[in-house]
Amino acid sequence: MKYTIKKLVFIITTVFLSIALAGCSTKTPTSQEAIDKYTEALKNIKSETYYSDVTVKDTIRNKENTYKFNINGTIVDNPLAMNVNIKIDDTALSLYMKNSNSLYVKQNSLSWRKYKSSSETLERFDSANKMSRDKENIDFLKSNANDFNVEEQGDNYVLTYSGSDTKYKDFLISSFIGFGEMSEFNRYDLKNITIKQTIKKSSFEPVELNITSELTYKYDSSVKSYIEIKTTTSNINLGKVAQPDDLKVTNNL
């Protein structure tokens, strides 16, 4: 009898423990499920703050040159508004736009200059901003979701692709924020690329994108380019575009 009761208690305890563990566990989504939810989250982003570092190392005739770029700021969609800072080597550029009306530009320590926001200017800035670039990738990611691995890291999921499929060169190009003409990439072949997109478990919103890639020049394989991109995203749908402190808007500016 004691044995039977002891066995029964053990079975009941095991059942309750199994239920408790099942209730506490979270199933890791497949890469397709994660990317579907991630791309849906992208569609709902109306404002955000971002910080992007780009490092390019070119090797030409065994000589290596390194270039560093940084672009950071806050952007709001519809109507387009932004406060963006760009640094390329020793050149600093600041851009401010509010309600798609006028664009203000400041280079290094010079004074702000006002430019009328033509439809062409708006189209150019709209296509080059981070939210537009992210949304450009939606169909591509959904179509190629099975190429990615997904793993849990704390409060996040990390989607990873590593390979050399040439179609990922387009993803690399669209991950450059704030850069206009990218036709120079047509002269290069993709040798390898690793993409790591970190997203929140709770909302599937972007946290950080890391890309490392190597390209070779089509007409001379000894010419190589190593590119590293790291972009973090925060303040999603909380970001507000504030007028720069040193910009005094008057009738003449």
Regions found by a protein language model. Name each.
Residues N72-M131:
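An acidic-aromatic
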Residues K37-L42, N70-D77, M97-L103, T194-S202, ...:
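Extended lipid/amphipathic-ligand handling interfaces
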Residues S47-Y51, D77-V84, Q153-T160, E205-N210:
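Short, hydrophobic/aromatic-rich segments at coil-to-beta transitions
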